[in-house]
Amino acid sequence: MRTTQFFLSTTKEAPSEAELVSHKLMLRAGLIKRLGSGLYTWMPLGLRVLRRVEAVVREEMNRAGAIELLMPAVQPAELWQETGRWAQFGPQMLKIKDRHEREFCFGPTHEEVITDLARREIKSYRQLPLNFYQIQTKFRDEIRPRFGVMRAREFLMKDAYSFHASRESLAATYQAMYDAYGRIFTRLGLRFRAVAADTGAIGGSASHEFHVLADSGEDLIAYCPDSDYAANVELAEALAPAAARGAPQEAMREVETPKQTTCEDVAALLGIPLARTVKLIAVMAGERMVVVLLRGDHMLNEVKLAKIEGLADFRLANEAEIRAVFDCPPGFLGPVGIDRSTIRVIADRAVAVMSDFVCGANKPKFHLAGVNFGRDLQEPDLVADIRNVVAGDPSPDGKGTLALCRGIEVGHVFQLGNKYSQAMNATYLDEAGKAQAMEMGCYGIGVSRIVAAAVEQNHDGKGIVWPASMAPFSVVIVAIGYGKSASVKNAADTLYADLMAVGVEVLLDDRDERPGVMFADAELVGIPHRVTLGERGLNEGVVEYQPRRAAPEQGADARKIAVAEAKAFLMGVLGD
């Protein structure tokens, strides 16, 4: 492709509303153009990247035994009403009516459509298992679309759905898809982690998320550098401390804390570690108050708390409810002296082994020090893991300690079980001729989101640094003075034709532009290999080669390559 025949639309500055690096660079490089809130046109350069990602995804899905189809983007309301999600999905679903006033939605996902297809077409256990996938445009009416295509309203997604006669069969396909996802992200040249995740609203028994590691990621991941363990912080287990509770060494006493309403302030006033303080969080489970105790340096994990019996729909108590029970404002609350006949006390594992700790006195402007379970207050009603892990915690797999990093979710796999098949009566006849609900799996990849995540992970001060497998072109030939020098034109055309003949994706920059502009565009767009041809170099019989991503030992200096050896040299580096 020649730039004079291509649509290259680069800019020096990104719009002020662009926040993430990927959003700024994708706009500046001309990969995308904004149409409206959360709506983007994929420009020719960006579409080339998107199609390369799509090709890798398609190859690995086919390799894993999935069968491609394409379902309608617009879906009838009746299917969603069968599962109850027409009302549950909320305002993210774009609902529309046709000329006959029949209701439809622009599909945010396709569980209902594929389950309807399965119940129509699958009759016998002999037809199972089956695994279908599509690469399809989705629409979710985000309340605040942002970050470019990272969180757009319209996006491209690969979604796959598998159907099974047994949970064992589902588990086998789940593992095959898990492995396929690993191959996809490895082939795309991305640093990623597969993490155990919460099944959330989709439901099911097992779930893993795939995260591209980037400082800008919205999700916090706990992982062990010494093993394969990784989990979303929502699910990462905080093990019980190895040490048992120590014997009391202090008498309980009141300490005046006139302006100190947080554990941090109290610890600073008393000159003690924050880990020696205990904070109380009051929550409501229906009409009953439940008290949650955490170490002062730990944070409540609401996902874990909601999994405790009776707390699935808990909410934080408001100030009026707190004052009605404690006769004390928030900031001075503690577990000593509360009515245990009406208030349930749940303590985190780390709190349960504490002695001589500091907590609120249930008295304005006072805290208690030297507090001990068994002596000054009853043992908790329940001890459970209800906190977020922190860096340095023991890894749940026993193979080291945890570290934390941020990630961008680009893939998610679920074992759905029979949630949708039961709701929609998707059954098959087993060997005994009895109708059984199919077991289902669901496997999604954000194809367009991968592009943005890759930019977040692969950029420098000059622009994008594409992994080779995602780059819109493999080689850019910068022909300085192409329209003015016959020798430059002939050499550039020859190298361009030679590379094209062997299947190399090459961009020939034959514009009448200043060299600085051509170099800046090549670096901004992020093409992995650049060859520069100029009259002076050709007079010496050389061209200049510059990799976009130089290996540390090579440095960033350009190399001079003999004109006659340019093709062979490039084929060598492209094969590395």
From Swiss-Prot:
Matches recorded under HAMAP family: Pro_tRNA_synth_type1 (MF_01569)
Per the record, its GO cellular-component terms are: cytosol
A Gene Ontology biological process annotation? prolyl-tRNA aminoacylation
| Protein name, as recorded | Proline--tRNA ligase
Q: Which gene encodes it?
A: proS
The UniProt entry's sequence similarity note says: Belongs to the class-II aminoacyl-tRNA synthetase family. ProS type 1 subfamily.
Q: Which UniProt keywords are listed?
A: Aminoacyl-tRNA synthetase, ATP-binding, Cytoplasm, Ligase, Nucleotide-binding, Protein biosynthesis
In alphabetical order, the GO MF annotations are:
aminoacyl-tRNA deacylase activity; ATP binding; proline-tRNA ligase activity
Coarse class of the protein's main subcellular location? cytoplasm
Q: How does it assemble?
A: Homodimer.
Primary enzyme class: ligase
Q: Which domain of life is it from?
A: Bacteria
Q: Spell out the SUPFAM superfamilies in the cross-references.
A: Class II aaRS ABD-related, Class II aaRS and biotin synthetases, YbaK/ProRS associated domain
- What catalytic reaction does the record list? tRNA(Pro) + L-proline + ATP = L-prolyl-tRNA(Pro) + AMP + diphosphate
Its ancestry begins with: Bacteria, Pseudomonadati, Pseudomonadota, Betaproteobacteria, Nitrosomonadales
Domain remarks in the Swiss-Prot or TrEMBL record:
Consists of three domains: the N-terminal catalytic domain, the editing domain and the C-terminal anticodon-binding domain.
As for what it does, the entry says: Catalyzes the attachment of proline to tRNA(Pro) in a two-step reaction: proline is first activated by ATP to form Pro-AMP and then transferred to the acceptor end of tRNA(Pro). As ProRS can inadvertently accommodate and process non-cognate amino acids such as alanine and cysteine, to avoid such errors it has two additional distinct editing activities against alanine. One activity is designated as 'pretransfer' editing and involves the tRNA(Pro)-independent hydrolysis of activated Ala-AMP.
